[in-house]
């Protein structure tokens, strides 16, 4: 095998794309800061006990593991940053009241989570801790939308659901975990025949409600239909009211619902949203409420947030034009060095042409050059 071959679904990021990614990263962090979110930087490596405690089987399977050469203990490369941020909120900050945190950094997946996906996403996310009300869910959703808009994303669709609806339908149903997994899989695949087989011995209200979920997707009318079809299930009406409340406060986007969407079922504790845009094969942003995320760290308090992969985002956002640069001669002349330094302090990109490379071009388009006129260095159009 050639020495330069990289692992499957791992790739170098070349200058043009790297510049675009970095511009998006800065814009996303600036947008989060505008909402009052503070940046944190968790480590890439942690012991598995803290990295995976309370996260479920799916994240465990996605985590690349290795042995710490100093202690002999098993460590993991993070596959998701949310649990680490919850640990920071619970133990290191331990603030009373609201805490708003954001992050941006690479994660590593043992397997790609979708076709043609990278196994090294650049994950950006934001979390708000300490508020139980729907205002926190709405703020997280508004921030996610503003992040996409600041990146130049248009034609946005927000898909809403609530995992508590399925939990309400399954309340009191006595079945083993394998059957429950099958029910979840059948709902996710909208497999009516399999769901009917698995729920044959369920109470009538649960069975009929679960079967009804397969048809409860679409626009706002879905909530009206759900109110009728799920009327026999206690606790569902307030959840539908909360989804309607959220939808009514989203402007400039299309809103849909899929009440059988169980992505992140073991992780989310309430409302859940996914944001889709043209050109992306999967949701660009996923988020919602996950109140139990900090429980394993001894501080079980309300939490809502979202995350996205900037490498996925860059594929659907038009690249911004590169600011034209200034070409300058290389030399030991203190005057030209001072002129170049002054231009760079003003925010200009100045590319020095090294001897013998005058005819070469690079990514930076130069529309001006630094020339000597009457003994003074000045910028002129090329």
Swiss-Prot record:
Its main location: cytoplasm. It is found in: Cytoplasm. Gene3D superfamilies: Bira Bifunctional Protein, Domain 2 (3.30.930.10). It holds the Pfam family tRNA-synt_His. It comes from the Bacteria. Pathway: Amino-acid biosynthesis; L-histidine biosynthesis; L-histidine from 5-phospho-alpha-D-ribose 1-diphosphate: step 1/9. Required for the first step of histidine biosynthesis. May allow the feedback regulation of ATP phosphoribosyltransferase activity by histidine. This function is generally fulfilled by the C-terminal part of HisG, which is missing in some bacteria such as this one. Heteromultimer composed of HisG and HisZ subunits. NCBIfam families: hisZ_biosyn_reg, PRK12292.1-1, PRK12421.1. This is ATP phosphoribosyltransferase regulatory subunit. The gene is hisZ.
């Amino acid at each position: 095998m050639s020495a330069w071959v990289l692992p499957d679904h791992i790739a170098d990021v070349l200058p043009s794309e790297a510049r675009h990614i970095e511009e998006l990263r800065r814009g996303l962090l600036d947008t989060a800061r505008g909402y009052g979110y503070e940046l944190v930087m968790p480590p890439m490596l942690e012991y598995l006990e803290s990295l995976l405690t309370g996260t479920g089987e799916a994240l465990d399977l996605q985590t690349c593991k290795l042995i710490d050469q100093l202690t002999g203990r098993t460590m993991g490369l993070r596959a998701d940053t949310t649990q680490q941020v919850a640990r920071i909120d619970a133990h290191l900050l331990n603030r009373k009241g609201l805490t708003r945190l954001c992050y941006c950094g690479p994660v590593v997946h043992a397997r790609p989570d979708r076709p043609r996906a990278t196994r090294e996403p650049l994950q950006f996310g934001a979390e708000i801790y300490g508020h139980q009300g729907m205002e926190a869910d709405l703020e997280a959703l508004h921030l996610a939308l503003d992040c996409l808009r600041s990146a130049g994303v248009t034609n946005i669709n927000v898909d809403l659901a609530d995992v508590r609806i399925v939990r309400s339908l399954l309340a009191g149903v006595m079945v083993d975990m394998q059957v429950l997994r099958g029910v979840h899989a059948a709902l996710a695949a909208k497999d009516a025949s399999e769901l009917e087989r698995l729920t044959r011995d369920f109470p009538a209200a649960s069975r009929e409600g679960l079967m009804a979920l397969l048809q409860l997707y679409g626009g706002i009318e879905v909530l009206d239909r759900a109110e009728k079809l799920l009327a026999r299930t206690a606790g569902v009406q307030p959840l539908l009211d909360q989804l309607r409340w959220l939808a009514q406060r989203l402007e400039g986007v299309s809103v849909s619902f899929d009440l059988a969407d169980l992505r992140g079922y073991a992780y989310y504790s309430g409302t859940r949203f996914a944001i889709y845009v043209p050109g992306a094969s999967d949701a660009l942003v996923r988020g919602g409420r996950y109140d139990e995320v900090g429980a394993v760290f001894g501080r079980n308090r309300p939490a809502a947030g979202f995350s996205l992969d900037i490498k996925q985002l860059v594929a659907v956002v038009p690249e911004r034009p590169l600011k034209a640069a200034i070409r300058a001669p290389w030399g030991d002349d203190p005057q030209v060095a001072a002129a170049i330094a002054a231009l760079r302090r003003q925010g200009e990109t100045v590319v020095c042409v090294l001897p013998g490379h005058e005819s070469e071009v690079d990514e930076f388009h130069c529309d001006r050059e630094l020339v000597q006129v009457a003994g003074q260095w000045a910028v002129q159009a090329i």
